[in-house]
């Protein structure tokens, strides 16, 4: 079998010039006046930063009326159906404050104090409600119930379960 050598002929190709011209495509032209003013939204009043001082540490929907016992049990039941561990927390102050340090850290008042231990193995919303009533009798400050996912190790749900009279 004889070896054959093929000679390739080199052809001159034009260098790459980019994509096709878009001159034939319709283009929406913006007026130059719309780009003349660049704004970060400084004139918008509905997007202001929440004041950091003098605010209660209530959660997202805390402006709503207090939950009834039935609504509270439904929330806890939802928490349990998702296999989250219920925990009770309370806050004596209700305000963000710094007592021992001027730098932000764990003990600067942004975190609530946990009531007893998380309720691992809890399967009934009435157990959580009974524990909430015991917590209210012992410390009549603000109470929150949270749902903790011990697999992902994250908090998935928090809501205000009890606000003492006179708190806003």
UniProtKB/Swiss-Prot annotation:
GO biological process: photorespiration; reductive pentose-phosphate cycle
A Pfam family it matches: RuBisCO_small
Keyword Chloroplast set for record: yes
GO cellular component: chloroplast
Entries under InterPro entries matching the protein: RuBisCO_ssu, RuBisCO_ssu_dom, RuBisCO_ssu_N, RuBisCO_ssu_sf
Transit peptide feature, positions: 1-45
Membrane-crossing segments per the record: none
Alphabetically ordered keywords of this record: Calvin cycle, Carbon dioxide fixation, Chloroplast, Photorespiration, Photosynthesis, Plastid, Transit peptide
Note: The basic functional RuBisCO is composed of a large chain homodimer in a 'head-to-tail' conformation. In form I RuBisCO this homodimer is arranged in a barrel-like tetramer with the small subunits forming a tetrameric 'cap' on each end of the 'barrel'.
PANTHER family: RIBULOSE BISPHOSPHATE CARBOXYLASE SMALL CHAIN 1, CHLOROPLASTIC, RIBULOSE BISPHOSPHATE CARBOXYLASE SMALL SUBUNIT 1A, CHLOROPLASTIC-RELATED
Protein name: Ribulose bisphosphate carboxylase small subunit, chloroplastic
Lineage, uppermost ranks: Eukaryota, Viridiplantae, Streptophyta, Embryophyta, Tracheophyta
């Amino acid at each position: 079998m004889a070896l054959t050598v093929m000679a390739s002929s080199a052809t001159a190709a034009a260098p790459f010039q980019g994509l096709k011209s878009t001159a034939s495509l319709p283009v929406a032209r913006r007026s130059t006046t719309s780009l003349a003013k660049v704004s970060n939204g400084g004139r918008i009043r509905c997007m202001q930063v929440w004041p950091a001082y003098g605010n209660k540490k209530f959660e997202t929907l805390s402006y709503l009326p207090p939950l009834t016992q039935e609504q509270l049990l439904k929330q806890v039941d939802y928490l349990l159906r998702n296999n989250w561990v219920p925990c009770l927390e309370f806050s004596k102050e209700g305000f963000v404050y710094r007592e021992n340090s001027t730098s932000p850290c764990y003990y600067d008042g942004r975190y609530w104090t946990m009531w007893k231990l998380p309720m691992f193995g809890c399967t009934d919303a009435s157990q959580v409600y009974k524990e909430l009533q015991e917590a209210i009798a012992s410390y009549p400050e603000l109470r929150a119930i949270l749902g903790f996912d011990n697999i992902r190790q994250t908090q998935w749900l928090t809501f205000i379960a009890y606000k003492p009279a006179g708190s806003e």
